[in-house]
Curated annotation (Swiss-Prot):
The complex is composed of two ATP-binding proteins (PstB), two transmembrane proteins (PstC and PstA) and a solute-binding protein (PstS). Part of the ABC transporter complex PstSACB involved in phosphate import. Responsible for energy coupling to the transport system. This is Phosphate import ATP-binding protein PstB. Belongs to the ABC transporter superfamily. Phosphate importer (TC 3.A.1.7) family. It holds the Pfam family ABC_tran. ATP binds at residues 88-95. Its main location: membrane. InterPro entries: AAA+_ATPase, ABC_transporter-like_ATP-bd, ABC_transporter-like_CS, P-loop_NTPase, PstB-like. It catalyses: phosphate(out) + ATP + H2O = ADP + 2 phosphate(in) + H(+). GO terms for molecular function: ATP binding; ATP hydrolysis activity; ATPase-coupled phosphate ion transmembrane transporter activity. It comes from Acinetobacter baylyi (strain ATCC 33305 / BD413 / ADP1). NCBIfam families: 3a0107s01c2. It is found in: Cell inner membrane.
């Protein structure tokens, strides 16, 4: 069930924070070409057993931009504490679909969504639903790191202060420290919490954004190409973090990297021209796909 959080308009009063920023609220496999398919080393990247508790579900979801249909009636169930990867060629609708899961498409005037999206069996498109609360419960990490123009501490503390999650400054300090620990960043920044978050490296900034998301106690974390702007070392740290976070959160990640999907996800969903073509365990999708379109994509024949 969704927790009660006090909401205010204080974010809107801070003109130094952009509108997009306000929407926030390991062991590697060798995944490479081998013949026609991507090899999938289950020994080096064991996948956890995903419990069949449905956290998010969509039913006949369509998304329109004006008269153009971007998502064509998708049904999908996302399980609690799983990592599910959305893959597909550019323009296939995977990011658009991801944004329906916490109503980020509401910010686009020409966008219209039909169908049902349920979080713990509650319709998130119910007109009486508090969207600010929803976006705290279903957090978003964007493609480009977008720290607030504030200190490292204030970046993480901003959400808890906004939502009234800390009783006093000691509570707030504990939330900030715990969130930075969970994001794998505490040891790197604990002695410079008052320095600007924008002064961190790209990989550190992305982990700071993840800490900021964690700080408001989400149940689901959506990630839209979170590593596309990062170097390989920073990418490896974020991927390891995803694995650790999945013990506490449900994670959906959009990625153009099939190798990344193979490394981090329990299940993979393949999108093509607004349709959900196939969803199955990541191992099966990459080694024995059911659909010819999936096979063509993962073997590099298009996309």
């Amino acid at each position: 069930m969704m927790n009660t959080i006090n909401t205010t308009n204080s974010l809107e009063k801070d003109n130094t924070v952009t509108s997009e920023q306000l929407q926030f609220t390991g062991a590697e496999t060798q995944s490479k070409r081998q013949g026609s398919f991507v090899s999938f080393d289950t020994q080096t990247a064991p996948k956890k057993d995903v419990k069949n508790t449905i956290k998010l579900s969509t039913s006949d979801v369509h998304v329109y931009y004006g008269e153009s249909e971007a998502i064509k009636g998708i049904d999908l169930e996302i399980y609690e504490n799983e990592v599910i990867a959305f893959i597909g060629p550019s323009g296939c609708g995977k990011s658009t679909f991801l944004r329906t899961l916490n109503r980020m498409n509401d910010t686009i005037d020409s966008c219209r969504v039909t169908g049902k999206v349920l979080l713990d069996n509650q319709d998130i498109y119910d007109p009486n639903l508090d969207v600010v609360l929803l976006r705290a419960q279903v957090g978003m990490v964007f493609q480009k790191p977008n720290p607030f123009p504030k200190s490292i501490f204030e970046n993480v503390a901003y959400g808890p202060k906004l939502h009234g999650l800390a009783r006093d400054k000691y509570d707030l300090e504990e939330i900030v420290e715990n969130s930075l620990h969970k994001a794998g960043l505490w040891d790197e920044v604990k002695d410079r919490l008052n320095q600007p978050g924008t002064g961190l490296s790209g990989g550190q900034q992305q982990r700071l954004c993840i800490a900021r998301t964690i700080a408001v106690s989400p149940e689901v974390i959506l990630m839209d190409e979170p590593c596309s702007a990062l170097d390989p070392i920073a990418t490896a740290k974020v991927e390891e973090l995803i694995s650790e976070l999945s013990t506490q959160y449900t994670i959906a990640i959009v990625t153009h990297s099939m190798q990344q999907a193979a490394r981090v996800s329990d299940r993979t969903a393949y999108f093509h021209l607004g349709d959900l073509i196939e969803v199955n365990s990541t191992e099966k999708v990459f080694t024995q796909p059911d659909h010819q379109l999936t096979e063509a994509y993962i073997t590099g024949r298009f996309g």
